[in-house]
Every structure is written in C-alpha cells, then in structure tokens.
C-alpha cells in the first residue's frame, strides 16, 4: 500500500473487548433529578461478578455493545451512557443482586412509553452473561412525566361524570366470556345494571368473533345501558372492548361507542401495545370517553420473581400511557397478589406523591406532579363475603368487579347485583360509623342479610369458597432469620 493511501487508526481508539464495568460501573455517580432510575434484580452467570453484570445491564440498555467501536469517539459517551451506580445483595437469595442504573433523560423520546421500554427492557433480557433479569421498579423524573398526558380523565373527573361519590364503584364481567349472542349478552348487561351495579364489562378476549360481532354487541349493550338508567335514575356504563387487530379498527370502534353516547370503552393494553393504547387514550380524552384497561398477558411478564418485569413498572407505564381504570389484583380472590405489594402499586396508580418504601416493594420516591390518577380494579374470584376486606383494602377510589360473584347467584343476574350492592352499602355505612371492617366484616354482612334475601342467598352459596394459595411474588426477606423466628 502506498503512503498516500495508507489509513492509520485515529489517536485514542483501541479496538478490542473490555469489561463493561470499566466504563459503566460508576459507584461514585450522584444521580440527577432528571435521570430515569431503574432497579434490576440481576442473577449473573457463574463466574460473572455482580459489578460486571450490573454494568452490562447499564451498557446494553443504553449506549454499549459487545466490543469497542470507533464511532464512540463521535459522541459524548459520558453524556449519554447508562450508569450502574449501586449494587446490593437480595436478602435470602444466593447470587441475586439489585443493580441500580441511571439513564440520562436525553436517551428517551418525549411522551413515548414504547421508546422507554424498547431501551430499558429491549435486548438486555436475552444477554448471555445473565442467568435471569427482572426490572423491579423505575423512577420517572418529573421532567419526563410532564411529556405525557396520562389518563384521559382521572379519578375526580370520572366521579363527576358518573355523579357517584363516597364509595367504591361496582362492576361485573359478563360470563360466559365467549359464546353468547349479542342480544343475550345485552340482556345479561341490563339485568346486572338494573340490579344496582355501576358497570358491566366485556372480558379481555371479547373482540369481534363470529358468534358476536362488535357492532352488534355495542348496540345491544347501549340499549341495556339506557334502559337501566331510565329505571334506576343512576348513570350506568359498560366497558365496550375496542381492542382490535389494527389501530385503525380500534379507533373505528371507539368512534362508534362515542356516537352511541356510552360513557366508557376498554382496551387490552399489553396485547394491544403501548402505541395503540396511547393513541386510544388521546382519542378518549378529546371525546369525553372514559378508558378501562385490562392487563391481559401481564403474568407472562411479571409472575416469575427472578425474571421479567414487576407489575408496579407496568402500572407506572399505564399511568403514563393513559387509562382511567386498570386491573390490579384483589389480594383476597383467585388471582396473584400479596397485600403489601399490591397496596404499593395501588398507591403508585392513585396518589400524586409516593415515598420510597421497600416494605411495600417501592424502590424509589415517585412524584407524578399533575398527572391524574388511575382507579385500581379488584377482579377475579371475589364474592359478597369478600366485600368487607375489599372495601377496607382498596378504599373508596376503586372498582370492585364481581363476575361469577354476580352471575352465579342462584336467583339470576339482577338478584346477584342486588346482593353485591347491598353488601357494599352495608360495609360503607359500617365503616363510616367507625366499625372495623377487618375484624367485624362477617358480622356486618350477616346483619345485612336480615333485610336482603338476595344477599342471604348469595352468602349461602359462597360461604365455603376460598382461594388459599401462596403468592408467587413476595417481598424479599432473609430466609435464615425467618427460620430462627
């Protein structure tokens, strides 16, 4: 090669592979108010130091790759790289660590949950140096929160729209979830609404199948709503599931719901995707529709304790993307949910400011500034005997949703709805009178059965029903200390 055409490496660039921790592990780093902070549960492969594993997570979820590249010199790596700034062992677990990672805000597109997750939980979860990886929590800085519109309306606006205050809202998922004709489906909705429920609901997989096309369902459910409203004098709603195969079809269904004058639509935000969800949320805000969110597929992501993503992260993401309700588990029903963990992410959904509290699984203080709150929905295997516990656990700003606990009543849907409404009103009144729902709950329900035969029949049917299984997702504790106790 002639001297004129010879190319020399630029000064300062050295090709090859070097440990991630040399660049991305920075324990001396002081986090900024504008950083997005993440807490990862890291299980390294044998022989991989925790500092290297944490640094690898920071690198692969921000600016790094497996080898040094010359284009690093064309940007300010210190400005844009993620940093692992802390490592701590997980109590009671061998070879598991919490790695704290800080991401500069400029790594993320404004107002895009999709981009945020693509960066933070994109390729890194398949990284070979890690046996398992779980995103436990995120701190969203106020500077980034303000780029999101959040829920279409929020808790207070929903109460004003419905003219319902001072108690949890009551709902019911129509069962069987698949197979009913549109007319029979609408009839089931009407019976539940006239019996005293505030809402009925499409199940997550009710979209537009051969046995019941979406337009027919919307029409018959709207008829049920208006008929029940005329008879009861209360505002009613049905969560019309607008989830579809394309965003265009989803929005077409939402437009039709608005034209019918119904108050609320529904979306499966994980299977539908965050881009679709945010688009639907914007439409609902602009057109006065409430938005109910179902979390179908969440357990695929969040149920394993050492790999995936905790639901508190999915809950925060939903508040940013937009939704007025979201299913949150029940603590007492058939679906997964430990009490302290559940109450932790319920607060993250509803409150404006949440302090760090590791006893409830909250790793970071979170300030939502002016972003509206989301109503948690307790649903799954609950019935009238659970009403005192649900009222005590979730409080007024919640939706208590009884599917089988309404439709399984021996006298039919309307008496099932009556039983739930009577049980709720009895619990709210007892609480307001200063009684302890946690210790007097069963007595309160028994007293109410004396003047409600519908409630008495429901209590008899479900008196022996319990779902006593240990939760998979539990708080971290020192197992050796627990054994000594």
Curated annotation (Swiss-Prot):
- What does the UniProt entry say about where the protein is found? Plastid, Chloroplast
- The EC number of this protein is 4.1.1.39
Does the entry feature the keyword Oxidoreductase, yes or no? yes
Q: Does the keyword Phosphoprotein apply?
A: no
The site annotation (Transition state stabilizer) covers 334
Q: Which CDD domains match?
A: RuBisCO_large_I
State the name under which the record lists this protein.
Answer: Ribulose bisphosphate carboxylase large chain
Give the gene symbol: rbcL
């Amino acid at each position: 090669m002639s001297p004129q055409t010879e190319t020399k490496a630029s000064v300062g660039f050295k090709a090859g592979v070097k440990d991630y921790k040399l660049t991305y592990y920075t324990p001396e780093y002081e986090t900024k108010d504008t950083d997005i902070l993440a807490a990862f549960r890291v299980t390294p492969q044998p022989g991989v130091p925790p500092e290297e594993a944490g640094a690898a997570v920071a690198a692969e979820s921000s600016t790094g790759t497996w080898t040094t590249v010359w284009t690093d010199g064309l940007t300010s790596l210190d400005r844009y790289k993620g940093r692992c700034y802390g490592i701590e062992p997980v109590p009671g677990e061998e070879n598991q660590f919490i790695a704290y990672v800080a991401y500069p805000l400029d790594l993320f597109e404004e107002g895009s949950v999709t981009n945020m997750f693509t960066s933070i939980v994109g390729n890194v979860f398949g990284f070979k140096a890690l046996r398992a990886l779980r995103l436990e929590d995120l701190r969203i800085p106020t500077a980034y929160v303000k780029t999101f519109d959040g829920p279409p309306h929020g808790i207070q606006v929903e109460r004003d729209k419905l003219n319902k205050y001072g108690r949890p809202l009551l709902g019911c998922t129509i069962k069987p979830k698949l197979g009913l004709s549109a007319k029979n489906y609408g009839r089931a909705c009407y019976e539940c609404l006239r019996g005293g429920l505030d809402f009925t609901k499409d199940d997550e997989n009710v979209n537009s199948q051969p046995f019941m096309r979406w337009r027919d369902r919307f029409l018959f459910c709207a008829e049920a709503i208006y008929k029940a409203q005329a008879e009861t004098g209360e505002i009613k709603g049905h969560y019309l599931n607008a989830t579809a195969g394309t965003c265009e079809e989803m929005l077409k269904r939402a437009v039709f719901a608005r034209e019918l004058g119904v108050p609320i639509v529904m979306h499966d935000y994980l299977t539908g995707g965050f881009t679709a969800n945010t688009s639907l949320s914007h439409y609902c805000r602009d057109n006065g529709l409430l938005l109910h969110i179902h979390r179908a597929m969440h357990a695929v992501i969040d149920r394993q304790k050492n790999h995936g993503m905790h639901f508190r992260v999915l809950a925060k993401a939903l508040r940013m993307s937009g939704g007025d309700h979201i299913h949150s588990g029940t603590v007492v029903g058939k679906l997964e949910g430990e009490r302290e963990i559940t109450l932790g992410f319920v607060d993250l959904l509803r409150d404006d400011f949440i302090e760090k509290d590791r006893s409830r699984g909250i790793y970071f203080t979170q300030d939502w500034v002016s972003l509206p709150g989301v109503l948690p929905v307790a649903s799954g295997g609950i019935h009238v005997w659970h009403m005192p516990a649900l009222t005590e656990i979730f409080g007024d700003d919640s939706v208590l949703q009884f599917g089988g606990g309404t439709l399984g009543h021996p006298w039919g849907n309307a008496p099932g709805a009556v039983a739930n409404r009577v049980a709720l009103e009895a619990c709210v009144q007892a609480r307001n009178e200063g009684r302890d729902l946690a210790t007097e709950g069963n007595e309160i329900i028994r007293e109410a059965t004396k003047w409600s035969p519908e409630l008495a029949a429901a209590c008899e049917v479900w008196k022996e029903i319990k779902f006593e299984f240990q939760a998979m997702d539990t708080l971290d504790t020192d197992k050796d200390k627990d054994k000594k106790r």
